[in-house]
Amino acid sequence: MSNAYLTYAAKRLGQAIVVILLAYIFTFVVVSILPGDPITSVLRNPQNGFTEQEIAEIIAAQGLDQPVIVQLWHSLSSFLTGDLGMSMRSNRPVSTLIAEVLPSTLVLAASGLTVALILAFTVAYGTQVVPKKYGQGLLRAFPSLFLSTPNFVIGLFLIHLFGFQLRLFRVIEPDSFWATFFAAITIGIPFSAQIAEVLIANLDHEAEQDYAAVARSRGIGPKRLFATHLLKPASLPVVTVIALTVGELLGNSLITETVFGRTGIGSLVQRSVSTQDLPVLQEIVSLGAVVFVVVNLIADLLYPLLDPRVKIIIGAKRRESIADDASLPLGTGAKP
């Protein structure tokens, strides 16, 4: 692994850390200025059953009687050490509340991503091997059609068709296999349209290159050409698409959980908003920002390893820098 790549990785890591810190501070400020007093609406709500002594202990433990800047410092310090604080509503650790529902959301998001990849690559494959007179135009219209379709519309349609009309699953059992399956499809279809749009465009571009024309002149058919020549170079941008849309994927998962009535991070967010449980809401949003930044960081670090053209660019920049420092033209002894 070259020094240029290590420098690049260290720079991207530093940028990611700064973005995470700024995202946490921004989230804290936004949550702090939300209308309403959580002490009155949550702690002093008779339905929650807190005594005055318990209220005083919670206020002192969470530092709610401290200035905002002090609260921010303590909150950020605790977050960086893995302490997500306590829920004002249940007086339980926020990390415990998230851990109870996170697996369900992760399973749904992973299932949706799997559906999206399978569907996107299938559609892209069809655009390269299916003759135009046999429906290739419909396959090429797939991204445009579903990019503009909200996922909750797809979810409601699937619930109506397969839940009420065909009765394939019971709507009151949102965690059943079929409910999870259709929830994954709800997430996967719009996401697959984004991937397919990029993949089809790159496949068309690669198909026009000289190496593809040479392969066709040697008698290689569309299926083999797709598998052995076009797929790999055209698939590299998909890594970037997935990284850039991971936030949308998680957001769609939360919306889909609400539509299908599933227990997950979405239901926890909904409950936290309705009860003004600000510590829970703040940590969920902050963790979402961390996931988004980390996934994009991984994509940035992987891309130079997956695409030789990116490595050449990194190396070329380093060679130019060394040549400039030595006042020598490239190729006269400057070592990369």
Range-by-range predicted roles:
Residues 3-6, 98-135, 151, 175-336:
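Alpha-helical transmembrane segments of integral membrane proteins
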Residues 19, 23, 27-31, 155, ...:
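Juxtamembrane/transmembrane-helix interface segments of polytopic membrane transporters
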Residues 14-18, 68, 110:
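Membrane-interface helix starts
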Residues 34, 146-149, 250:
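Transmembrane helix irregularities
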Residues 1-33, 228:
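Charged, compositionally biased N-terminal leader segments and the immediate start
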Residues 20-70, 167-182:
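Hydrophobic alpha-helical transmembrane segments of membrane transport/permease proteins
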Residues 139-193:
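Generic hydrophobic transmembrane alpha-helix motif, especially the helices
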Residues 55-96:
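Short membrane-interfacial helix/loop motifs at transmembrane-helix boundaries
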